[in-house]
């Protein structure tokens, strides 16, 4: 079995350290032959087997952060779309997979999974949606089979998927929204698996 090279992209946004610690912990517990590194170098991504894109804050800041690294978006497209290697987006990192986001204007995303990032309707609920909430798994036949339990969320915007088959799990907060999206080699969670104790580590695994 080939050694895994997992790269967590550092582009000035996202909880890089806790993501790295979670991956390192899984590698240790499960005794997986893998290295995990944090990098903003497209060359490093090219030589990786798995790529993780964390993200928090505003969509626009995150996508700009990626665009400002020369060659980064091209290499990501190459890695994910051309080579079809495993990719995992967390929180805003997952939202960046969409075609566009309506957060503070209209901003273009990576466009890997069809859909738009829209504001959660607040009505009577506190925003952001913050804290623990449960997920309902809609497709149990995949390599990733998360526990239907509580995960840690912090967000005010959600991924409105065009195709229902891209929704692996949903969560309710005023409305049902996708808490895990997927397409072929691409997975994304709206919640923070690195802050979701053991069940979060399960997903990372």
Residue ranges of predicted features:
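N-terminal beta1-alpha1 cap of cysteine-dependent amidohydrolase-like domains
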Residues: 1-87, 92, 114-118, 124, ...
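Beta-strand-turn-beta hairpins that frame and shape the catalytic cleft
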Residues: 4, 148, 182-186
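Asparagine-centered polar/low-complexity signal
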Residues: 15-18, 133, 185
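Hydrophobic/aromatic beta-strand patches that form the interior of the parallel beta-sheet core
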Residues: 52, 88, 152, 168, ...
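Pocket-forming structural segment of enzyme catalytic cores
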Residues: 71-74, 99-173
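Histidine-centered divalent metal-coordination motifs
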Residues: 91, 155, 192
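C-terminal and late-domain segments of enzyme folds
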Residues: 158-205
